[in-house]
Amino acid sequence: MKKQFAVMFCLLAIFACLVGCSGKTESLFPSAFVRAVGQEKADALKTLGTTEQALSDYTVDVYGKTADVQLSFDAYRGDETSAGKLNYAELTVPCTPNDDGFSYMRTCYDKLEKALGGPFTTDVNMDGVSAEDDTDTLFAALQKNAGGENVCALQYQWRGLGENESLLYLYYYPNENGSARVKLTFLPKERAQIP
């Protein structure tokens, strides 16, 4: 009887562990995200890892095709002590594309700043790059390394630049006093796809 009880206890413990582990995995992909991409794609995403970068790359593939005249901002919030436990939220800031890529970006950035309750301080002086500069120079100025930090990332699919269409990351770091610092990272389109 004691042996049977011990076996049952062990099986129960294993089951509890499995349930607990699967619960933790699911928390990496909130229901809003799973509903948006579908369970099959969400499961496939798990094989890519649970890093912010994997989620961001995947989101480009999912949302990029529909981001025509609007910028879809997908926010992943987390911190180093709860790595991977990211809350999913979506913020859409309307922005009409125009022929001037710089003013288009500047206008959309201003709208993002207002929507998030800015002003922000930024690693890139947006006003320091003139509209006359070619896009390559502008993009080079915006290219920053996120340093692997997993605090909060805002991203949008850049549309309206023809063959230069790419992804611009805005890494948003909230501070205790309510202000924020923004890092901008330009990611070429070919690097923004899932392998």
How would you name each of these model-derived features?
Residues M1-V7, L11:
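Positively charged n-region of N-terminal signal peptides that target proteins for export
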Residues C17-G20:
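C-terminal motif of bacterial Sec signal peptides marking the signal peptidase cleavage site
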Residues S22-K24:
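Bacterial signal peptide processing site
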Residues S27-V34, T96-D99:
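Short, recurring structural edge motifs at helix starts
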Residues R35-Q39:
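A glycine-biased structural micro-motif
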Residues E40-T66:
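Post-signal-peptide N-terminal segment of Sec-exported extracytoplasmic proteins
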Residues A67-L154:
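Long, charged/polar, surface-exposed segments that mediate recognition or autoinhibition
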Residues P94, V129-P195:
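An acidic-aromatic pocket/loop used at catalytic or ligand-binding sites
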